[in-house]
Amino acid sequence: MIIFATPKVCKGKTRILYFYLSKLFFYVYFFFLIYYSIQKHSYINSTMPIIPLEDDKDDDWILEDEDDPEFQAILQGNSSKGPAQRTLEGSVAAVSTRPQNDKYETIPVPVKINTPTHHAMDFENLKTYIYPTNFEIRDYQYNIVERAFYDNLLVALPTGLGKTFIASTVMLNFLRWFPISKIIFMAPTRPLVAQQIKACCSIAGIPSSKVAILLDKTRRNRAEIWNSRQVFFTTPQVVENDLASGVVNPKSIALLVIDEAHRAKGNYSYNNVVKFINRFSDSYRILALTATPASDVEGVQQIIDNLNISKVEVRTEQSIDIVRHMKRKTVERKTCYPSSEITECIELLAEGITPVLNTAKERGLLDLTDPTRINFLQCMEISRKIVANPTIPEGLKWSNYFILQLLGMVGQCYRRLNIYGIRSFQSYFNEKFLEFKTKWNAKKSTNKLNADFYFSDPITTLMDRVEELSKTLTYGHPKIEALMEELDDFFKNHETAGSRVIIFTEFRESALEIVQCIEKANDNRKPHIFIGQSKEKEKFDVENFGKKKQKGQTKKKKDERPSTRSSSENAQMTGMSQKLQKEIIKKFKKGVFNILVATSIGEEGLDIGEVDLIICYDSTSSPIKNIQRMGRTGRKRDGKVLMLFSSNEESKFDKAMGGYEYIQQHIMKGDFIQLRPQHRMIPDEYKPEAVKQLIQIPEENIELKAEDDEDEIIRIATSYMLGGKGKKGKKANNNSTKKPAKTFFMPDNVETGFKSAATMVRKVGDNKSLAERNKEKTFLDKLVDSDSESEVDKENENVIQEVDKSKNQEQNDHIITELDNTEQSVAGNTKSTTNGTSYSEPENNNQVNQESVTANLDSVARVPEPEVIENSESEEEQISKITHNTPATSVDLSNGPEETSYKIDSVLIDLIDDDFTFSSDTEGDKVEVIDAVSPEVCKLPEKPATPPIRKSLGVKRKVNKTPDPESNSISIPSSTTKKSHNEVTRKVVQDPSTTNKKSLGVKRPRPVSIIDQLKRQKIRSQVIVSRETQSIIEHESRTQSSLPSPRNMSDEISEIDVIIDLDDDDDDDNKVNGHDKSQTTISKVQPIYEFSNKEDEGFLSSSQTRELYKNYYIAIDSSDDIPFYDPVQGFSKIKDTDKFTMGRTGPITHSLRTQRLFQACNAEFDSQLAAQTKDNDKQDYTFILKK
């Protein structure tokens, strides 16, 4: 430990030295402590043992108390909500072995490997792509074309830089790669469509035989055109309509070219077409072309989302690869300040509106003090919000609304005075003044605030002054004077006939004023107005206001244009149709007019021609409009742009263009936008290499290339599409063509119709769906619980048909051959054994028709495969297996005296009698099948059979139950492929008094199964048979023969004659045929379980009880419960007689109670059964019931 002396002991220099030494020691000691702590921490981390997560030496043994079942039940969890079940001693009962709730899993659907595209491709052409060398090769075009093959591309290029060339090249190569797919070029207007047809056919050389033009929605052979062509030029509205009507398959479209893509906003048809195609396929390419994508980031992102754009290619006029290909374009600005006359008018207007502005300020509507700063758009926005506000009272709301409307009108007047001049202001203000004055005088308006404004002294003075100035001033605004000076200089320097000028302005009144001013110059200037199709807005009719229209009053006839009205004045009033627009443009190109004064109609898309000078009379805050205007010049030769500014126009223009350039730069870098994922159509193994070659233009395209008229281009292209039938002036007669039915297209790999959830899930560990299991359960339920024989027969037929379809052809041929042999042998025996009665048939009847045999296969039921029976088994066990034939047991079919047993797959038994021949009074032979009831088969002597006699129609009769002691043997063919010398035989009894043909219209006796008998609990005795023996009894009941069954089991109730009801339903058939009973007494044929109504009997014997649970209990899934009768539930003990009686109870589920009895019979009471005698008939099973 270091001890420092106090500073007071030291003096002078020693004291200073001590001070510094003490500080040094302090810092050294401090850093030493830090270093020591770091080293210690690292040592602890490196030497500390890591405790494994899985520690075998834990305290889990505490939870493994196996002696406490209640504690174990808590740990394992109890699914039941109630308390644990306990025994009489108080301990917790054992957990039931009944399976818990089934767990289900989703059936895995195999994932289909998606190929790059579903379109058919030409892989040989896919190795290369053609780049036309007909024009100059430009780097930016080359790069954009290659990029368009792999991405949905948005191309933003300045006007005149070859966007159409890029589209044509991409279309040409997609046509080579996807020869049967469709390529669609969409443009918003007909003139643009015509321009693109001319460009694509003259650049890429696409044959006209593959090109179609669709501009008419009413054309009736649209489906034929869509199916026969590959390249289509059309408008988006036409494509949207054809997609919605099912005329064109959306999955067949491989390329979609969109011109003027900046329109893809809102609910425009471009967006609807892309949305519709996306519903069916994403394997198609989009090429979007525009000069100005949007003025802000949100607009660009909206286009990207609507058109699924995955890549953006943007070039500006300052781009490196663009500059050297741009023509020199000089942009000149000129600011024109308002004249003194305009300033005087502005002051008078401000003096008149000041009281209204003060009222608006008091109400909090506007926060302005200078009336000259009133803005039209601002006032309209505030008024819209006020109307939409439900909290403002109605009176105050509409009062504020009219104030803002008046202020907005004044703001528009300011704009017209500052930008367009006095004449434009006069036209607008006079119309508003006349409208209000007329309504005020007619007492239709009570707005005192507006009256105070319009009838005030400043406004009256203003109107008089404007009227005077419009007559004396040569130019209404200094801009017009600057424009005239520019035109003078231009035409002096460009005296050639090819010089062209376009002047852009926003309002029609201003355009007409400019035209009139130019016309007054009387020189070589030839101007004309160029506006849209809509008519001039209908002005307020002062004369007819308030007058009622007379009934039947016709519209006024069109006023003929007076000779003093010029073409531009008439166009300004009536609008310009497309025909007139094309005529003006055609004359402009030819030099008839060399100046066009255009509104916004001339800004976008139109190829007006070579323009040397562009004058922007006004400017807007939209950079897109400004760029479109300036792009009309400098395409093929140098040009000049003159921007005329007034008031605050220049600042707005600079702000808009500066923001647009900023956005363009960030879009080029990929900032601020989120692109969609890429989807390749070309396989990854292919990367097409460029092949630069000169494109040979087909002869049919030369005519399109030489044509300049848009209508003529459309007509020529249409005539080629129709095979030369579409001549000018002729219309095809399509009246006989019917409207095609609408086609509904589905996406790839879609499943139509409804699909249940059960078909898509399965139990864990199962290989079949829940629906398939339910279907099997439903079939078993119908087989067990059905009261109608027809339902069982129908199910048997369906199962037989499914089994027959699954067999191979070789096995079926073998079965048919065996059936042929059997039928021939039966026919031969029948013919040869008749009792002296001739039954002649043609000789060719021995050959069975293959079609009839094949048809009869549907009516054949298959008996489950019997197994070989061991001779070592006891007689009773053999009888038990033969008698109680279930799917789990076997049948011994012996073959005559040889007593040989064979294992066969199935036995074919005809269950359907298709013979509906009418019967006579006599009856023929009857064939009856008798089960083998003993290991020893008695062979009866043969007896000739009498010829079959037809039955009577519709009369029920008793069946003669006295059998013939003699019978013949008929072989039943086996379905196995192995052939054997021995035949599996059945004993057949021929009865001369009966026939095997059923009578038409008479219900045949139906055998009743054990389940039906136990469910009904009828008082009269009934026969209970197994499922396998049921098919034999059904055949026996159809033949309606009877034969006493030999006693094979010592049963005290087996000798009872059984009455089988021929008519299972409870109708009143006996009332119709009263002379004949509806039932027949038939000796029982191999009964299994029988009940009697004797008082001393009421339950099964011990042997029958044992056989019931051995042969009829089948372990099935707990969810597939089958209604089953539990005999124990119905037992009751009589105290006097000390005997058990059988009660009449309903069906219960195949549950644990049945399982308990089954286990009891097999395992639990083996010791007690062993103590008894080995004679099964004398064994006592009542102790099971007692427990």
Swiss-Prot record:
Locate the compositionally biased regions of type Polar residues.
564-576, 822-848
Q: Which GO terms describe its molecular function?
A: 3'-5' DNA helicase activity; ATP binding; ATP hydrolysis activity; four-way junction DNA binding; four-way junction helicase activity
Q: Which CDD domains match?
A: DEXDc_FANCM, FANCM_ID
The enzyme's E.C. designation: 3.6.4.12
Biological process (GO), any one: interstrand cross-link repair
Q: Where is the Helicase ATP-binding domain?
A: 144-311
Basic and acidic residues compositional bias: what residue ranges?
781-817, 980-989
Basic residues composition bias: residue spans: 547-556
Entry keyword DNA damage: yes
Which EC class, in a word?
Answer: hydrolase
Q: Which family does it belong to?
A: Belongs to the DEAD box helicase family. DEAH subfamily. FANCM sub-subfamily.
- Self-association and partners: Interacts with the MHF histone-fold complex to form the FANCM-MHF complex.
- Name the chain's protein: ATP-dependent DNA helicase MPH1
Q: Which organism is it from?
A: Candida albicans (strain SC5314 / ATCC MYA-2876) (Yeast)
